[in-house]
Amino acid sequence: MAAAPQAPKRGSIRKTRPLVVKTSLNNPYVISWSTLEREDIHFILQTLEAKFKLIGLQKIEDKKKRKKTALMKKQSCRPDIEISEDPKEPDGDVLVSGWTPVHVRKQLVIGVNEVTRALERNELLLVLVCKSVKPAIITSHLIQLSLSRTVPACQVPQLSERIAPVIGLKCVLALGSRKNTRDFADEVEAIIPRVPSLNVPWLPDRTQGPTDSLETEPSESQDNEILDTSFDDLTKLSKRKLAEGGQASAATLQPLKIKKLIPNPSKIRKPPKSKKSISK
């Protein structure tokens, strides 16, 4: 006898998802911090450490206050225990939490976020970055920012290890001095000549002063010549100047390469849960 025909299985067949390939253009330029010499590293660290110790800049944290807040949280969880609210007057010898000389702290910028904001507003004279920052992309944007604002900046090894314990912080990833600084004026003047220049291909080096040949205001004779010349002659002159400027510029364009990101096909991916299974 012939076998009975089998009924088709119920349920939908899951289709395999196609691999999503992300295409992007890579950056042909390699931007990195300029290297400091050993003598300059020791000089910068010693001058900063000595100045901070001399001024006495330090952040004081009240440990008793932290313990008290932790106890209050524990006691608030227990309703049976009564919390004694006896206000105690602080002793005169107890140090208040915060920065000791506030006016000195206002002259400095500490941390990557503060340094970034101050550079955007063009308020800094000098920027120092710790070399132990991981990943390096955290401070890589400061290279373009400092060069566009004509602010000398460099990467100093062991900056956080040497300066953070003196100030009373856990780490110092970036440090900057404001333009209105008075207490650190001599130190900034001594450090700036030791800072190497940064190299960004698409940004010109603005640390050099403007040349004498460039004139801000045209003379009366030049104005009369411009009025006498026709429109066609002016367009020719402008095109010639643009061509000369393009030849003088040292920046060269680099070819871009297409980068494709393909996900790992051997990775075991969990299938998405259906709405029916979630409702159950």
Curated annotation (Swiss-Prot):
One of its GO terms (molecular function) is ribonuclease P activity. One of its GO terms (cellular component) is multimeric ribonuclease P complex. GO terms for biological process: rRNA processing; tRNA 5'-leader removal. The modification N-acetylalanine is found at residue 2. InterPro entries: Ribosomal_eL30-like_sf (IPR029064), Ribosomal_eL8/eL30/eS12/Gad45 (IPR004038), Rpp38 (IPR042848). It is found in: Nucleus, Nucleolus. Component of ribonuclease P, a ribonucleoprotein complex that generates mature tRNA molecules by cleaving their 5'-ends. Also a component of the MRP ribonuclease complex, which cleaves pre-rRNA sequences. This is Ribonuclease P protein subunit p38. The modification Phosphoserine is found at residues 12, 221, 230. It comes from the Eukaryota. Residues 267-280 have a biased composition (Basic residues). Component of nuclear RNase P and RNase MRP ribonucleoproteins. RNase P consists of a catalytic RNA moiety and about 10 protein subunits; POP1, POP4, POP5, POP7, RPP14, RPP21, RPP25, RPP30, RPP38 and RPP40. Within the RNase P complex, POP1, POP7 and RPP25 form the 'finger' subcomplex, POP5, RPP14, RPP40 and homodimeric RPP30 form the 'palm' subcomplex, and RPP21, POP4 and RPP38 form the 'wrist' subcomplex. All subunits of the RNase P complex interact with the catalytic RNA. Several subunits of RNase P are also part of the RNase MRP complex. Keywords: Acetylation, Nucleus, Phosphoprotein, rRNA processing, tRNA processing. Belongs to the eukaryotic ribosomal protein eL8 family.
